[in-house]
Design a protein with these regions (language model features):
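Histidine/cysteine-enriched polar flanking segments
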Residues: 1-381
Length: 381
């Protein structure tokens, strides 16, 4: 008997986005005190206001916040559809990173949520939308997986068994096998080997890099950062026959220590090299390591944390990508512009979404705060 193929995971590229979900903690609706430097509702409101009218956003909030959330939504110049969903039970919402909480598998009208964490949110949404739920038997945060048209890119830390990858690298780890079972697409890993550090050609031209069979990433692999979606974007495009990824290229900014930026750059250069060896085409995009506006900690601005479509909307000339922007609050306009220019150059209509400085101290941005529930078909020929 052949195993029944699971429904495919919702990709990070392809058809037009139809519905997305967000989760807003009660703390976001607390009265802003004059001393508060951050207002997390600003970037969320800007995102909702930047979505086309035919997208519906389902917003989960706890019951006590429903009135405030309704007032706030009413104040936005948003043309997209919005529906508020009260959280089931008495649980609260501890953070807005809905991307991490569950995986969406869907084909046509059949939708299934694979619950990972903060399960009340996935359950409330599924009940409201009539989706099925199942529990994941492996802890894989949505932020540590990018889903391409025919591949998945998973952060190495999620593929490693707790005891490390087995001595015999030819035997996939148990976690690798469980993650593979989530979906029919092949898994590639985001990580680097210590011996790759400092090995990258100065031009960062990976097009000539020898590919290897995606060998089981050996036990000496490390992952840069917490989640792959902090530093890598899937584009849904191919370049020279290889799937094209955007990989962040960090620089120090605003008085941040150049050493921290150089260290992050070494790890991301080495990670880009490993991606190229697995058969990806790589384009680099500049990101600043800059003091967060509330904590002053030097942190990367997550320009790779995007939402995109590859199908062109009616009346448009190019497909849309929504890119987090920071120049409205910090002196980062040039980074906003450089990142827009890169997406424009590879064929997108870039929609900059301002305000993400308000969430940068929490290491998240636009993709982290959203979950795509439904997309139209990828009608590209």
């Amino acid at each position: 008997l052949s195993a029944i193929q699971p429904l495919p995971l919702m990709p990070d590229c392809g058809g037009l986005i139809r519905t997305i979900a967000l989760a807003l903690p009660a703390a976001f609706f607390a009265e802003n005190r004059a001393t508060d430097t951050v207002s997390p509702l600003i970037p969320i409101g800007n995102l909702l206001s930047a979505l086309p009218a035919d997208i519906t956003a389902f917003i989960v909030t706890d019951r006590a916040s429903l009135g405030s959330a309704r007032d706030w939504l009413g104040s936005l110049p948003a043309s997209c559809g919005t529906e508020l969903i009260p959280l089931a039970g008495n649980d609260g919402i501890s953070h807005p990173w809905i991307q991490d909480m569950f995986h969406v598998r869907a084909v046509d009208a059949a939708t299934e949520f694979v619950l990972v964490a903060e399960k009340a949110i996935g359950v409330s949404l599924a009940e409201y939308l009539g989706a099925a739920t199942t529990h994941s038997d492996v802890a894989l945060a949505g932020g540590n997986q990018l889903v391409g048209p025919d591949f998945r890119l998973v952060g190495h830390s999620s593929l490693q068994d707790d005891r490390g990858i087995g001595r015999n690298a030819a035997i996939p780890s148990q976690r690798w096998r469980k993650i593979q079972a989530l979906d029919g697409r092949n898994i590639f890993s985001f990580g680097y080997r210590p011996e790759y550090l400092g090995k990258v050609p100065v031009s960062s031209d990976f097009s000539t890099t020898e590919t290897c069979e995606a060998e089981m990433a050996g036990e000496k692999m490390h992952q840069c950062g917490f989640h792959v979606d902090q530093f890598v974007s899937v584009t849904g495009l191919r370049s020279g026959g290889r799937p094209l990824l955007l990989v962040a290229d960090p620089v120090a900014h605003g008085g941040c220590n150049t050493r921290a930026a150089t260290e992050l750059k070494r790890k991301l250069d080495a990670s880009a090299l490993w991606l190229a060896r697995q058969g990806f085409a790589i384009e680099r995009n500049p990101i600043p390591l800059s003091p967060a506006i509330d904590t002053n900690k030097c942190l990367p601005r997550l320009y790779n944390n995007v939402l995109l479509e590859n199908v062109i909307r009616s009346g448009q000339k190019r497909p849309f990508v929504w890119v987090p922007h920071f120049g409205d609050t910090e002196s980062l306009e040039e980074f906003d512009a450089m990142n827009r220019e890169i997406w424009d150059r590879i064929g997108f209509q870039t929609i900059g979404v301002a305000g993400w400085s308000h969430l940068s101290s929490r290491n998240g941005a636009l993709r982290c705060a959203t979950k795509i529930i439904n997309r139209g078909p990828d009608t590209r020929l």
